[in-house]
Curated annotation (Swiss-Prot):
One of its GO terms (molecular function) is structural constituent of ribosome. One of its GO terms (cellular component) is small ribosomal subunit. One of the primary rRNA binding proteins, it binds directly to 16S rRNA where it nucleates assembly of the head domain of the 30S subunit. Is located at the subunit interface close to the decoding center, probably blocks exit of the E-site tRNA. It comes from Mycolicibacterium vanbaalenii (strain DSM 7251 / JCM 13017 / BCRC 16820 / KCTC 9966 / NRRL B-24157 / PYR-1). It holds the Pfam family Ribosomal_S7. The gene is rpsG. Keywords: Ribonucleoprotein, Ribosomal protein, RNA-binding, rRNA-binding, tRNA-binding. Belongs to the universal ribosomal protein uS7 family. PROSITE patterns: RIBOSOMAL_S7. NCBIfam families: rpsG_bact (TIGR01029). This is Small ribosomal subunit protein uS7. Part of the 30S ribosomal subunit. Contacts proteins S9 and S11. GO terms for biological process: translation. Gene3D superfamilies: Ribosomal protein S7 domain.
Length: 156
């Protein structure tokens, strides 16, 4: 454990094309092996496809998708007297954004479309319409928290 406390959060620069921090975070989640320009090409291509299919601002579509994917509750393991309980806890706002982006990207990778641009675009569109694997993951997470509500008094 570090003695100086938690590392400070570095400021996030706005995206040069859309002027949105959310797009920057999405680019960083898509990023593999330090290939930032490739990640940007994938994200911008996906957002452009989303614009063509919906006819609306892609950042608005992305935000709507994020609102549908962001979890408000999750379960954390807590050991009490030799038993491990799944304790439901509220998710911090920054963690909910991180989880939503992680789920969007990971479930787009698992899709069947040909290119990553198409996969990401379709996952964002599905999520903005309340469909898709990322939204299902959020619902499963909430269901799990609801099922373990009896252990909520073990929160820390």
């Amino acid at each position: 454990m570090p003695r100086k406390g938690p590392a400070p959060k570095r400021p996030l620069v706005n995206d040069p094309v859309y002027g949105s921090q959310l797009v920057t975070q999405l680019v960083n989640k898509v990023l593999l092996d330090g290939k930032k320009s490739l990640a940007e090409r994938i994200v911008y291509g996906a957002l452009e496809q989303a614009r063509e299919k919906t006819g609306t601002d892609p950042v608005v579509t992305l935000k709507r998708a994020m609102d549908n994917v962001k979890p408000s509750l999750e379960v954390r393991s807590r050991r009490v007297g030799g038993a491990t309980y799944q304790v439901p806890v509220e998710v911090r706002p920054d963690r909910s954004v991180t989880l939503a982006l992680r789920w969007l990207v990971s479930f787009s990778k698992a899709r069947r479309e040909k290119t990553m641009v198409e996969r990401l675009a379709n996952e964002i569109l599905d999520a903005s319409n309340g469909l898709g694997a990322a939204v299902k993951r959020r619902e499963d997470t909430h269901k799990m928290a609801e099922a373990n509500r009896a252990f909520a008094h073990y929160r820390w």
